[in-house]
Amino acid sequence: MDGFDKTMKFSIQDEKQSVHVNDVLLTVYDALQEKGYNPINQIVGYLLSGDPAYIPRHKDARSIIRKLERDELIEELVKSYLKHHREE
């Protein structure tokens, strides 16, 4: 019965961990462009408001972008911007 006295750890791969921000943004960008929208305006609208209506269902873009939290998307955008524009 020693096995029952120990606390076991259960680990499950979170679906969000397997989703890459870069892939999400590029897929959503392409879907918006194909539908004739201004991708930057639509993505910014979604990030600021949280309203998924800014993102079309085309190419499953709406469900893809909702796999990540908005703050995760914003964090990665800021990191990427600073990485590419920072002078050291």
Curated annotation (Swiss-Prot):
Pfam entry (one): IreB
Domain of life from the UniProt record: Bacteria
UniProt family annotation: Belongs to the UPF0297 family.
Protein name: UPF0297 protein BC_4382
Source organism of this protein record: Bacillus cereus (strain ATCC 14579 / DSM 31 / CCUG 7414 / JCM 2152 / NBRC 15305 / NCIMB 9373 / NCTC 2599 / NRRL B-3711)
